[in-house]
Amino acid sequence: MTRQSATLATPSDENAHPVRARIIQHARQHFLMHGFRGVSMDDLAVGLGISKKTLYAHFASKAEVLKEVIHTKFGEVEADLERLASADGASFPSRLQQLLECLQGHLKEPQPPFMRDMQREPEMFAWIQTLRRERIQRHFGKLFEEGRRAGLIRKDVPPKVVIEILLGAIEAVINPQKLEELELTPKTAFPIIVTTVLQGILTDKGRS
């Protein structure tokens, strides 16, 4: 697969085309649940009940379909995080909890078969890691800075360090092999990791 840009472009108007949108939705459900390496364009066409000609009229290859699935997924992540981070009147603990719950919810969708396939596509995997890092740094970094100024996060722990710890925790949560070793699932692992991280960075005031 070709090298991807680190940022996501604004979704094009053609994504609003009902057939194209249906292709993306069908591929998303299948890819994220069962993986994508064993799926052909023929399989997608059959599953959608459309001709290969129609499928290829919208996407030139499976790689393009996969890229659009990821584009759509991270567009939703960005919109949700932005909405929660900019909520007026919400306290620091409330906003942090909401952001973490949002992140956990989005991490539930990609299943181990997808992650295994993705790890065999180094450039695409690196692109996803970059997209994830950008969003966590932007939304959580800003919130951690606010919490630090309010005396809710320890001043001796730089927000950048907290971000790296959180990113490392997420990498562990979505690594199928690591989860198998720990006998955990993403659903059970994420709360454990988050609780451990937060207990280490919050002040007594932040925990109260």
Can you annotate each of these PLM segments?
Residues M1-H34, G38-G47, A63-K67:
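Basic, helix-initiating cap at the start of DNA-binding domains
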Residues K67-E68, L202:
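Short, Lys/Arg-enriched C-terminal cap helix and immediately downstream tail that follows
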Residues E68, E82-E109, P159, I163-L166:
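Hydrophobic alpha-helical connector segments
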Residues H71-E78:
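Short, basic, alpha-helical segments at the C-terminal edge of helix-turn-helix-like DNA-binding modules
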Residues M115-Q119, A126, R148-V194, D204-S208:
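Hydrophobic/aromatic-rich alpha-helical bundle segments in the mid-to-C-terminal region
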